[in-house]
Amino acid sequence: EVNKSHQKEDLFLWKQADPTVSAAFHYLAAQLYKHERDFANFYKSGILYLAYVDCMTLGEDVAQELAVDLALAALLGENVFNFAEFLAHPISKFISKESKSEFGWLLDMVQVFNDGDLNAYDELCEKYADQLNAQPALVMHERKLREKITILAFLRIVFELPAEKREIELADIAVRTKLSVDGVEFLLMKTLSAGLIEGEIDEVSSKVVVTWAQPRILLKPEIQELADRLDQWIQKVS
């Protein structure tokens, strides 16, 4: 019994590892993934690294470089569809327009992806064409970026609806995503296969019924939007 007690105590101490060790581990992992151009795992490791360090102590140049790398990884990472961890973290301020960073356009782009706003995305692509073309990875993956923002535009439709009323006409999705109905069906299959939603496509009535959507971290404006919708619902039922 005494030995078991010591074993549990040792395990507890192991789990409470020195934050500097954890920071070093995630930093090295992030650098490895960056070298391998594994955007999704770099993003994950970079965010975990920031959980163990104060980005304000990194130095402005280092922090800005990390912010740029994370923003690019968020956009380019396979199956990275939640950007709130980055947008809500102080590291993002190092590429904000308020900080007079030349990469303010990149933060705008991440925000547009988080919002699932296709129209704003098209506007930014036109407005910041020179900056986008100066980033080879973004140019190389232009088609994937378009596919990703389109999926996010659809997810935005889903999140705007009450959980019990997520029956959506394919024609309505086509308008919001700028796709044909056939394109919408392909989009839905991609979204289902990525595990972002669960549901069924009713081809007879040209509808999709979404029974579950992957939870997402909300930013303050999105929380306020939910609160406003709740107030409206309370007013209707009272």
Go through each PLM region and give its residues.
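Charged, E/D/K/R/S-rich low-complexity terminal regions of large eukaryotic assembly subunits
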Residues: 1-51, 55-238
